């Protein structure tokens, strides 16, 4: 049956902590607490270990055969204590008699109750110390325990204060029978052959007591025969003493002629007076009162020293002595990797921890030994004779309070006579918390999913919230514990705090499905040749669309508003039995995103450069897009038929942009073309097909389709129409499609060039697709899935993310310097005086919306805030007019018209609707709208100067200044600055201007007039009046 360690400790009369250490030494691991359970086998193993330890430290003494013919050693005379106490000394029965007959021969010995080990139960019998005297050969014992030639018995007494023996203190400082006095070792005789010898009488008895020689303090611990120090208070000795084995102490037998040394019971006071062993153990002051009252009436015990041989435990085998073999060595303990890693995390090394534990144990043992004086039993104190009487203490609760204040508030033990014997308190172990992380290191990296909050990051990384918040504030981020942190911020935190963590984004259905589709590698056996995708890039009005019209055989230029391309187009044509896909991009500055999309989906980029203009800003942008896409570049030098063009100048400019012509040893092919006359068209087409053959473009038509959305629009009769280009696989009618925030099933597809319906589209094929729920974003990738619910979930997640970004608003960044300026000016917390321009934008395609947004981003002004309330694809509806009326917004329509309801509501409520078909016209009107909402600029215009010649005072009117206009003119409603003695003393509004008696609008130079100022009558002669006016001038964004 399992047993707790503390229950086994009570059974073995041990301390629970000591038994825990014994369990560890016995080889039983995982039992570091007194509440741990031990099985029957483990308990038996612990008992066997304790028995083995006791047998090893206490060897069984050799039995001495008793002989009557052997003379005994002389016994030293015992000091007579009757003079001090008035009572006769009693004998102390140390140990138990070797034979029952020997105990019966002593009729004066008091009856002792016998326990299981043969030890007397009750109070420990006091031991009488005898002075060192000269040997008395005439005092012969009738019996001798051993012959002269026989080996002397070795008797060990327990060194710990047991219940029945009382021979030593728990701290190991009690003196056993084998203690040395004056450098001589005492050798006692057996109890049967040592009769009590009366000590010398006192002076009152007629005999002079011999003078005790001065004794020096002997060492407390006894020495073994081999000279090795056996320290008192050892674990095996204490266990043997508490388990009933009385053979722990050792007494060296006397040799003939050597006197018996004094038996000591005091701990460290070796040179004090002899204690009275028969008086009650009261306080010193109470003992003095009892001595004055008279002698004690209690029965005095008869003291007798019985030095009988103490047999060892019968069930324990004799263990070899310490000198019989080499000293035991500790096993080599190799440090594991976990321990080494734990040391790096703040854990102490095993050796350092063991040394610290040993030092703490020695320190506690030392403190216990210093605070314990002559303990005969646990918690009982023996008061020496020479102790000075203490001061009279306080009574009642005051005494207890004072005791607690000086640290003596322990448990109080009351003696049999009602007096306090000893105050002691059990010291509790003090727990010191150290700020060191003692957790074992992780065996693998911590994974943190992003985005996460600051709290989640701290819990995952093991950092405190205060440290993370302090680091984020140091980075200039004012966040709270629930704020989200992105991937970059988490990386900065990990670097700052030296964390070895793995950051990963949360797994979603999109990542699971879309990533699998994108990363699926095609089998080389399934790849077939596909048509190349050729994109025309260049500056506006350089002839891109004209070149494409000549190659394709159509005329798109005439249908474009303003003669410029404002939409991206894609066509697939067959030329000499070989298919080529062409993509036309706008060249206007506003269509940067369209050019970037065209460069990303292309295989070959055709850079169209006008021979008369050369490299222009949008040409440089197109070069950067093509280089970023890492595609071959072919330069079409257009308009070569114009007079005065210099092809070498254009090629020099291309070389400056790292495009070296093949004619000059580079790798860029330059084809001279003319779209109007058709010059160089065949050469350009052959060059493109040759480059396609060299690169061997291929795709797998048997897999699910994926590609890019080039453009999307909302049509009234067909709904959402998306222009897609298939990059890999085959797209069929009925496929489930997800493209950005849009999803749906393919209902119909049309050819982009002819408009004919088609049922499937292979690689490098542009199509117009119907069936999506909303217009997808231009540039979004599309994928074909197997389940409509998965497509709906992915599209919904994308739409939610887009909504969160749009609703997040714009956070104004305030630097510390601007914050200080606002604080000093008292403008902190005040809203800026800005004018808001609300817009509702409707366009025919997603690409047009992107172009308009790009143009609006140019008009960033601190006094005007442009807010786009809604942007969408399709015509202007009644809801748009209602929203514009409620928010005082302007509706901008690009290539769309309002319906009848929207037009009538706009006329009724005064909503402004502006329609455009060319992007730069829309840009000019938006600029005018913004400039019209700017505050006009005030300019000061100087008009003239007048000198005050004479001053007239009229009671009802005021002071009139007669002036002479010396410069310029004085006009009505102007302002006047009054200058006197070279400085301006005031600035006032002109109230009245008269010439003779008539009010006039203006007085020219050289004329005299009368001037009256508003609110100022202190005009004096010789003052100078300066006339000026403030004009408001409309401001420009430039």
Swiss-Prot record:
Region described as G3: spans on this chain: 584-587
Residues at which GTP binds: 538-545, 584-588, 638-641
Region (G1): 538-545
GO CC terms in record: cytoplasm; cytosol
Alphabetized GO MF terms: GTP binding; GTPase activity; translation initiation factor activity
Residue numbers spanned by region G4: 638-641
Main location (coarse class): cytoplasm
Extent of Basic residues compositional bias: 422-435
Compositionally skewed regions (Low complexity) per UniProt: 65-77, 100-113, 131-147, 311-328
Membrane-spanning residues: none
Residue segments, region G5: 674-676
UniProt cross-references to Pfam families, sorted A to Z: EF-G_D2, GTP_EFTU, IF-2, IF2_N
Boundaries of every tr-type G domain copy: 529-696
Residue ranges of the region described as G2: 563-567
Gene3D superfamilies xref list: 1.10.10.2480, P-loop containing nucleotide triphosphate hydrolases (3.40.50.300), Translation factors (2.40.30.10), Translation initiation factor IF- 2, domain 3 (3.40.50.10050)
Region (Disordered): 32-442
GO BP: translational initiation
Domain of life: Bacteria
Compartmental location: Cytoplasm
Residue ranges with Basic and acidic residues bias: 204-217, 275-295, 331-344
Key words of the record: Cytoplasm, GTP-binding, Initiation factor, Nucleotide-binding, Protein biosynthesis
Coiled-coil spans in chain: none
Function per UniProt: One of the essential components for the initiation of protein synthesis. Protects formylmethionyl-tRNA from spontaneous hydrolysis and promotes its binding to the 30S ribosomal subunits. Also involved in the hydrolysis of GTP during the formation of the 70S ribosomal complex.
Family label: Belongs to the TRAFAC class translation factor GTPase superfamily. Classic translation factor GTPase family. IF-2 subfamily.
Name this protein carries in UniProt: Translation initiation factor IF-2
Organism: Rhodopirellula baltica (strain DSM 10527 / NCIMB 13988 / SH1)
Upper lineage: Bacteria, Pseudomonadati, Planctomycetota, Planctomycetia, Pirellulales
